[in-house]
Amino acid sequence: MTDSKLRIATRKSALAVAQTTMAADAIAAANPGLTYELVSMTTEGDRRLDKSLASFGGKGVFIKELEVALLEGRADIAVHSLKDMPAEVLPQFKLAVVLRREDPRDAFIARGGAAGLKFMDLPAGARVGTGSIRRVVQLKALRPDLEYVPIRGNIQTRLSKLAELDGVVLAAAGLKRMGLADQVTEYFSTEQMLPASGQGILAIETLNVIASHGVAKQSIDSILARVNDAKTYAIAVAEMAYLKALNAGCQFPVASFAEFADAETLMIRGIYWDENKKNLLKSEVSRKMDLSCANVIDVARQIGIELADSICMQLR
């Protein structure tokens, strides 16, 4: 950080830049006099579009270059989609804050856009594109008679596949942040399809030590604290704890979704694909939580672990 300018690492994709700009504007608005600059870069996950994420490293491929920029002092913070982050960050880094969650659902876009056929109305054998094995196992549970085609790339690239597919499934949050919600045919409820852990959440990562460049880490923490959403942070901790407990990443059809059922009750639901039995396991856990308590993060983490334990019992 130089003077009052915050350097923010981001991927170069249009969605990443849009999301990072949203986060940066929120930080600047909460800290009068603070300015920022984006430090954009291309990650391994952006470059290797010819292979599935599971085949060459999973979630970390979208954040490694940004973390290197933090370590080398080229950036003060990094903005990620939480669903792109591994369940546990490396010791030298910290999940500092998260912004309020955007729509966590998955969206179906048919050929023809908003006026196209809804997912359940597609004819047998219709071809639907998605780059997520999590989505595929849940979509197959709804419509085993369809063909699911792997696709990768940015939002526009995936939407262009509609020329050869009958529909695609994308995260609602990205579509809304890119101003493309008007193209959505329908949204899947979280009961129909559980979203990826962390989906719709923007996470801000920092070094976990005092920066050797610019201001102290403590000062950056105080700047970021003004934009943290406490409820979303608790939700993020619970969902990522579930993934960590199952040692899961992009290679596994696994998901969790937490939400506050009321002001003091955090409920988390999870799924896990049992490859041996070809069965989609499901479970849920609820617990009272006081966001004002000092141990709120520990409680959120424990809720995620309890959910994972419940799933593991079904695997025995």
Task: Give the ranges of each region predicted by the language model.
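Short, well-ordered beta-strand segments
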Residues: 7-9, 78, 96, 129, ...
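Short glycine-rich anion-binding loops that position phosphate/pyrophosphate groups of nucleotides
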Residues: 82-85, 173-175
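A conserved helix-loop-strand patch within extracytoplasmic ligand-binding domains
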Residues: 82-83, 91-145, 208
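Small-molecule-sensing regulatory modules
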Residues: 2-48, 55, 141-316
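Paired acidic/hydrophobic, glycine-rich loop segments that form the ligand-binding mouth/hinge
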Residues: 71, 76-80, 166-171
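Short, structured active-site "lid" loops
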Residues: 50-77
